[in-house]
């Protein structure tokens, strides 16, 4: 989903193999493989004016293919280096990132964990307990449904990182506010 040629090959493969539906990832690591008002474009897309999803949909539909989009929901970043997009949520909304500790979040320290494959660290997640996170995600979903002729919306990583997470300071404060006796 980074250039016309790769999309054309994908559609051709689907047609040759008699697919009737395709599922394409449009949000991987807090970035977009489409033009978005809320999500920075993936740095893998070299032509900044290219909208992969807008290119894909009419070509796929012309071949009788239904197009479903797949989004990594709470997983925000899984590389050991910071994203280059200055408007990426890691840079603009650090307070939305979930944590497994009540200590201040050390993003670079967390990203270094991704270099160690055996520790189970998948990456940085948005906090499901932070209401602004969910408002943002709903805007992203709505944008896709309203702006693109898609046939389905598939949500992946719609969970906490693991059972030790959920310690985003805002989430804890909000929990305490509504559960003062616990």
Question: Which functions belong to the PLM regions below?
Answer:
Residues 1, 27-29, 72-76, 157-160:
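Active-site beta-loop-alpha junctions enriched in small/polar residues
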Residues 5-32, 147-152:
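Catalytic domains of carbohydrate-active enzymes, especially glycoside hydrolases
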Residues 5-9, 51-55, 132-143:
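Extracytoplasmic/secreted proteins, especially bacterial periplasmic and envelope-associated proteins
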Residues 11, 28-72:
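Aromatic-lined substrate-binding rim segments of carbohydrate-active enzymes
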Residues 17, 23, 32-39, 111, ...:
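Mature catalytic domains of secreted/periplasmic carbohydrate-active enzymes
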Residues 22-24, 67-71, 153-156:
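Hydrophobic faces of well-ordered beta-strands that scaffold small-molecule active sites
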Residues 74-147:
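Active-site-adjacent "subsite" loops/lids of carbohydrate-active enzymes
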Residues 77, 83-85, 130, 147-182:
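Active-site-proximal loop/short-helix segments
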């Amino acid at each position: 989903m980074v250039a016309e040629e790769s999309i054309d090959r994908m559609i051709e493969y689907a047609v040759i193999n008699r697919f009737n539906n395709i599922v394409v990832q449009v949000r991987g690591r807090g970035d977009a493989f489409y033009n978005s008002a809320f999500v920075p474009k993936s740095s893998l897309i070299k032509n900044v004016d290219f909208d992969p999803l807008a290119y894909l949909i009419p070509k796929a539909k012309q071949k009788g293919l239904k197009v479903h989009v797949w989004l990594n929901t709470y997983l925000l970043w899984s590389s050991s280096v910071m994203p280059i997009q200055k408007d990426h949520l890691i840079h603009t909304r650090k307070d939305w990132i979930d944590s497994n500790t009540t200590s201040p979040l050390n993003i670079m320290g967390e990203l270094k964990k991704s270099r160690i494959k055996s520790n189970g660290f998948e990456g940085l997640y948005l906090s499901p307990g932070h209401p602004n996170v969910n408002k943002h995600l709903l805007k992203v979903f709505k944008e896709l449904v309203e702006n693109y002729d898609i046939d389905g919306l598939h949500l992946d990583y719609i969970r906490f990182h693991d059972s030790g997470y959920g310690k985003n300071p805002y989430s804890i404060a909000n929990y305490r506010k509504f559960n003062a006796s616990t």
